[in-house]
């Protein structure tokens, strides 16, 4: 099966780089699924995005992403994010508290984290 080269980078660190069979996320114009040989595009991610990376024979990666951009070429997907964290790094109770914040940016980050751990859709 053809694969995508995926790189997810936050301001403070490289989050993940590797091969994937499918990538799903949300942009400002809607949800998007990327398969190998996708048409090239650049899109802005929503502030409460969750990125799901499907890999051949391995568990899916779920990553909470706070804003950023998605760049797609025929073989490569690059995500540049303000911040990002794996679902395994997320404290669900802290994410729930953040999601209820009056600050829209903090609330968006909390929702992204809850999506990554599978607590909300």
Swiss-Prot record:
Cross-referenced Gene3D superfamilies: F0F1 ATP synthase delta/epsilon subunit, N-terminal
Naturally occurring in which organism (per UniProt): Mycolicibacterium paratuberculosis (strain ATCC BAA-968 / K-10)
Keywords: ATP synthesis, Cell membrane, CF(1), Hydrogen ion transport, Ion transport, Membrane, Transport
The organism's place on the tree of life at top rank: Bacteria
Subcellular localization, as worded in the UniProt entry: Cell membrane
Its job: Produces ATP from ADP in the presence of a proton gradient across the membrane.
PANTHER family: ATP SYNTHASE DELTA/EPSILON CHAIN, ATP SYNTHASE EPSILON CHAIN, CHLOROPLASTIC
Family as reported in the entry's similarity comment: Belongs to the ATPase epsilon chain family.
Name of this chain's protein: ATP synthase epsilon chain
CDD domains, A to Z: F1-ATPase_delta
Pfam families listed in its UniProt record: ATP-synt_DE_N
GO molecular function: ATP binding; proton-transporting ATP synthase activity, rotational mechanism
Gene Ontology, cellular component aspect: plasma membrane; proton-transporting ATP synthase complex
Subunit record text: F-type ATPases have 2 components, CF(1) - the catalytic core - and CF(0) - the membrane proton channel. CF(1) has five subunits: alpha(3), beta(3), gamma(1), delta(1), epsilon(1). CF(0) has three main subunits: a, b and c.
Topology with respect to the bilayer: Peripheral membrane protein
């Amino acid at each position: 099966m053809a694969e995508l080269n995926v790189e997810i980078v936050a301001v403070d660190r490289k989050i993940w780089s590797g091969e994937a069979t499918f990538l799903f996320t949300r942009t400002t114009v809607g949800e998007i699924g990327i398969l190998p040989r996708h048409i090239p595009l650049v899109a802005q991610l929503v502030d409460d995005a969750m990125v799901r990376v499907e890999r051949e024979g391995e568990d899916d990666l779920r990553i909470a992403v706070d804003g950023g951009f998605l760049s797609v070429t025929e073989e490569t997907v690059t995500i540049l994010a303000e911040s990002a964290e794996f679902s395994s790094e997320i404290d669900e109770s802290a994410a729930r508290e953040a999601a209820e914040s009056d600050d829209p940016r903090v609330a968006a980050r909390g929702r992204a984290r809850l999506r990554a751990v599978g607590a909300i859709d």
